UniProtKB/Swiss-Prot annotation:
Residues 335-385 form the FBD domain. Residues 1-47 form the F-box domain. CDD domains: F-box_AtFBL13-like. This is FBD-associated F-box protein At5g38590. It comes from the Eukaryota. It holds the Pfam family FBD.
């Protein structure tokens, strides 16, 4: 302890910054010198783990008492996660106001506010804010004549827009936004989504099954990465355009694979995709080098055949099951018919073939054997039996594949 006490205060504060905030606060009982050291921490993390009384009353009282007196001139990050009814919207509103006055860089709020606003209009003019993460909150009173000039990362999870406000109104005051993640659960107030952000580089959009959605419109000319999880089973419009710089896409379309989605991703170099639908003729993925295809659904092989045919420069092929699709895996696959002619990528470019969750269904074997027989420039193949070995053991898988292959490959 004597050695630690010999360190300067700024170094002790740096050490405290590596432990959870509540642990840092607990060091205040060590000595008079340590009593207020934690109050110089630039990063504050308040969650329900602070509870020492029923509900979050202990946390509420602690923040009310100490946040206004916090000594750090800049609060680099403030994280608050709690759904306790003891903490009111006006409490959070006050804490956010203090953080803004201390030039907060990163703000992470998770609190169900029951359609009550937790943001003052002045918040939307915060010049220092770089990252904003909101969960289960309500947004209203979004002024149009101000902006968040430094905001680059925005995450919205189950955020409600009321009184006619919309996602696009928020996006329109974020002139340098680069990373946007939207997880939609606001069924009542949002029937359509519009995302028009000229500066955006990365977009993740999740659309749930139960939502009665009219459609979504996306215009992001600088986008380089797209993650689209469209699980909606209702017929809806989609318009995705103006993505000339897109290089990587993750598309999980549970029911429909809109034409505009395919049109927007033909320039990618890396594609991860799961869909029960094909996409029709007339599309070519000339730049696609790395394809990961999820085969959880029965008709996945037909999509594989299309993509092999339309990706003449494919170098890496990975067949797998997406992590959250394990429960959707069917007993059999349908729709695998060997192409009438061997795809160009198998003849000239495919070098790596991976199948990390090989299930051993008859169709799985047919696909694997077809690729191994016809890939003329294959350098590396990795096929691993499904960890649970639901359909085939590792030993049986190896035996079946070796028996099916010609001697020159074995």
């Amino acid at each position: 302890m004597d050695k630690i006490n010999g360190l300067p205060d700024d170094l002790l504060v740096k050490i405290l910054s590596y432990v959870p905030t509540d642990i840092a606060v607990s060091t205040s009982i060590l000595s008079k010198r340590w009593e207020f050291l934690w109050m110089w921490l630039p990063n504050l993390d308040y969650t329900s783990r602070w509870c020492r009384k029923p509900g979050d009353v202990g946390l509420r009282d602690f923040i009310h008492k100490n946040l206004p007196l916090h000594r750090a001139p800049v609060i680099e990050s403030l994280r608050f996660h709690s759904n306790s009814p003891d903490i009111k919207p006006e409490d959070i509103r006050r804490w956010i106001e203090i953080a803004v006055s201390r030039h907060v860089h990163d703000l992470d709020i998770d609190h169900f506010s029951e359609n009550e606003n937790i943001f003052l209009s002045s918040f939307f003019a915060c010049k220092s804010l770089v990252t904003l993460k909101l969960r289960s909150v309500t947004l209203r009173d979004i002024p149009s004549m101000v902006c968040l000039p430094s905001l680059k990362t925005l995450l919205l999870d189950n955020v409600s827009f009321v009184e006619g406000k919309s996602l696009q109104e928020l996006l329109s005051i974020c002139p340098v936004l680069e990373d946007l993640s939207v997880y939609c659960d606001d069924y009542e107030n949002t029937k359509e989504l519009t995302i028009v952000v000229p500066s955006l580089l990365s977009l993740s959009l999740y659309i749930p099954d139960e939502w009665l959605l009219d459609g979504y419109w996306i215009d992001t000319p600088s986008l380089e990465y797209l993650k689209l999880e469209d699980w909606n089973s209702c017929d809806h419009l989609s318009l995705i355009k103006n993505m000339p710089k897109l290089r990587e896409a993750y598309v999980d379309a549970k029911c429909f694979l809109p034409k505009s989605v395919i049109e927007s991703i033909t320039s990618v170099k890396h594609l991860t995709i799961c869909s029960k639908d094909g996409y029709g003729d007339g599309f070519v993925f000339n730049q696609l080098e790395h394809l990961t295809l999820c085969v959880c659904r029965g008709d996945s092989p037909s999509l594989l055949g299309q993509l092999l045919k339309d990706s003449p420069n494919l170098r890496i092929l990975e067949i797998s099951v997406m992590e959250d699709h394990v429960d959707d895996v069917g007993i059999s696959l349908d729709g695998w018919n060997q192409p009438s002619s061997v795809p160009e990528c198998l003849l000239s470019s495919l070098q790596i073939f991976k199948w990390p969750q090989y299930l051993g269904r008859p169709e799985d074997r047919d696909i694997a054997v077809y690729i191994l027989k016809n890939a003329r420039h294959l350098k590396k193949t990795t096929i691993l039996a499904d960890r649970c070995e639901r359909f085939v053991t590792q030993r049986r898988m190896i035996k079946e594949l070796l028996q099916a292959l010609p001697a020159r490959i074995c």
